[in-house]
């Protein structure tokens, strides 16, 4: 069976949290206004989240059927960096540098990405991306894949990307005491945001996003579904990201991501059992700006005397 490869075409984005004041009910704000607010929010966020570094603890479990016994568990420790790339069409990439697998170091933890990116971006970006691609080989499963970016869905809300998708309001939810509107999305046509293998390069994305019911565009949760067919094999990938307020940064940041990659094979007599199922749970912490120590994490600016 051909190796599974999912590659992200656009940079991952994140959103700046807004104030709760002025919240409108889900029935009081139109879908157009919600999407406009989210798009404006993404644009305004570029400076606030530039070169943000975080720590990722990622546990993956491999099964040979859904709900079956775990065949293998892998625990990955990584540094992740959200970087701004001028002229790339979208403002954000997420780069992952694995430093530990199952408690054993795979390299010296020396903030490699951070050191590359605090200097001239043009000089360090190519090497940083090579490091991130190298880390994809530590994922469990038959093929290398890197769709597992917690902020990927936020890219779909960028004003230049929204026309590629259809959106529909579905319901409401309360997250951290705030009212959010559930919106379903579906990618309309190629070329697609997420790229597949050469034999099937276009992978149409679908899912849901929860946008604050007010006017600030804050996203509290995202859900992504991808499906790729190669010969007799069908791979379905899902990822759900939870966001929470992070006062030191004055942002809503991704704190947890659940993902699943499931591959099934169709034989001459119909579907067989799943070839493999990989479930992942990633947790994020230690958000700070590149070049700033964890003891010097961002602080909300103090009011200045007039």
Q: What kind of feature is each model-predicted range?
A:
Residues 1-5:
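N-terminal secretory signal peptides that target proteins for export/translocation
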Residues 7-20:
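Bacterial N-terminal signal peptides
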Residues 25-206, 214-220, 226-237, 246-253, ...:
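Structured extracytoplasmic
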């Amino acid at each position: 069976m051909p190796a599974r490869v999912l590659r992200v075409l656009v940079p991952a984005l994140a959103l700046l949290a807004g104030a709760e004041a002025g919240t409108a009910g889900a029935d009081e704000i139109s879908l157009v206004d919600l999407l406009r607010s989210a798009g404006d929010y993404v644009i305004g966020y570029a400076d606030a989240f530039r070169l943000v570094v975080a720590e990722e603890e990622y546990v993956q479990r491999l099964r040979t059927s859904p709900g079956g016994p775990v065949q293998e568990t892998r625990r990955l420790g990584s540094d992740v960096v959200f970087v701004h790339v001028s002229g790339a069409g979208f403002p954000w990439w997420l780069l992952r540098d694995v430093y530990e697998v199952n408690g054993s170091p795979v390299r010296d933890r020396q903030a490699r990405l951070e050191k590359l990116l605090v200097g001239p971006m043009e000089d360090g970006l190519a090497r940083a991306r090579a490091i991130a691609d190298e880390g994809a080989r530590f994922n469990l499963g038959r093929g290398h894949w890197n769709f597992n970016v917690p902020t990927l869905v936020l890219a779909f809300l960028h004003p230049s990307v929204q026309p590629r998708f259809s959106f529909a309001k579905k319901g409401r939810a309360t997250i951290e005491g705030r009212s959010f509107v559930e919106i379903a999305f579906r990618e309309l046509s190629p070329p697609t945001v997420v790229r597949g293998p050469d034999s099937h390069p276009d992978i149409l994305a679908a899912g849901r996003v929860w946008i604050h019911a007010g006017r600030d565009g804050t996203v509290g949760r995202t859900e992504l579904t991808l499906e790729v067919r190669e010969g007799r094999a069908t791979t379905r990938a899902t990822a759900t990201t939870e966001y929470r307020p992070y006062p030191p940064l004055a942002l809503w940041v991704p704190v947890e991501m659940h993902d699943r990659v499931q591959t099934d094979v169709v034989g001459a007599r119909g579907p067989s059992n799943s070839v493999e199922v990989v479930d992942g749970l990633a947790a994020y912490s230690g958000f700070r700006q590149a070049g700033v120590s964890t003891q010097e994490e961002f602080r909300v600016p103090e009011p200045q005397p007039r």
